[in-house]
Amino acid sequence: MKLKKIIACAAAFAMTATCFAGCGSTSDSAADTSAETSAAAENDSAADTSEETSGEETSDSTDGEADPETRTIVDHTGAEVTLPANIDRVVISSILPLPSVYCLFRGSADDIIGIHPSSMAAAENSYLINVFPEIANADTSFVENGAVNIEQLLSMEPDVVFYSAANTEERDLYDNAGIPAVGFSTTMAGYDCIETYADWIELLGDIYGDSESADKIIEFGRNTASEIKAVTDNIADEDKPKVLILFNYANGVITAGGSDFFSKYWIETAGGINVAADLSGSAEINMEQVYEWDPDIILITNFSPYLPEDLYNNTIEGHDWSTVSAVNNGKVYKFPLGMYRWFPPCSDTPLVLKWLAKTIQPEKFADIDMDSEIKSYYKEFYGVELTDDDVQNIYTPA
């Protein structure tokens, strides 16, 4: 399947489209899940500090005159970071979904010289590497067994490293090595996925001095959230289905998404009731708990290898799903997989919210044509035209 490339006026979208690859492999999802949940456990006090200061730009000069060769920004930890005015060598470390957001904002992965191995695994099994094939050239060797090898990183000569603001020890490594490092938070927006996505874009706008591009992307996301909430805020609780997100389900272990996690935002904003709301973060559950909740809808993320058919056919050893309402009524769904897994914030976040609203409240959102929404978004923000087959492959990761 070939992508037809849109010839856009903006140079940001001047990239080569390639064949659409299968985007459903979850063989590396266990490592990714661990990193995602680790990043979601950030210190709230750091987030509070950054919320007040992030986005402020200061000069890097002792005499009050701006240095034209540097730019000083405030990251999501509240730290002032002095960066080169022209950034050509970027490493993206422990903030795993950020490569997709970076490519959305910059329109290219040309400046990315290194990414986390888990981010590379995700890219190779998603749409990202097809639209931005240059990301395949990024080096992953600076991370060994989940830890940063600072000597290897120094040999790559990065202008800046982007990392998860939760990882204070990682930040110490960069500071001690004299590498400019910018922390991106997953929690400062209270697990609001649209606002987290907006925070990341805004910080990239500060880093590159391009608030105009940032504002366009942020506006689209916030408008999407406003449109969905205008409907779901007026739905009575008795008209909201009970929803269970299986955040990670493999090897006999079921992990559900509770409160203080992205699942809360997704379910409640899209018009559902989170049956796991009494749990904190992502928590292990058993089938007895599932039977007690008896969810109307089950959503399986791409951090799990299972598909809806595995529950419908009751083929998962040791777990009997046959009596659960969502299974009996054919309402088990796998999250789609576009530029990144559609659960944590990523470059496709506005589409995730529309898909969830359509899935959880189909009658209320009958006017949403997801095929058209996906094609329009990819054309406007990535500069590619998707075929019907491309869209179906996003919906049905293997």
Q: At which residue positions do the language-model features occur?
A:
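C-terminal motif of bacterial Sec signal peptides marking the signal peptidase cleavage site
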Residues: T18-G22
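Extracytoplasmic substrate-binding proteins
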Residues: E170-G252, A276-A277, V327-P397
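Alpha-helical, coiled-coil/dimerization segments enriched in small aliphatic residues
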Residues: T255-G281
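Bacterial Sec-dependent N-terminal signal peptides
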Residues: M1-A10
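Bacterial Sec-exported substrate-binding components of ABC uptake systems
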Residues: I6, G24-V101, E212-L246, A366-A398
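A short, structured surface patch at a secondary-structure boundary
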Residues: S94-Q152, V160
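Structural recognition of the beta-strand scaffold that forms the well-ordered cores
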Residues: R89-S93, D111-H116, V160-S164, A181-S185, ...
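Proline-aspartate-enriched helix->loop->beta-strand connector
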Residues: T140-N145, I150-Y163, M287-F303
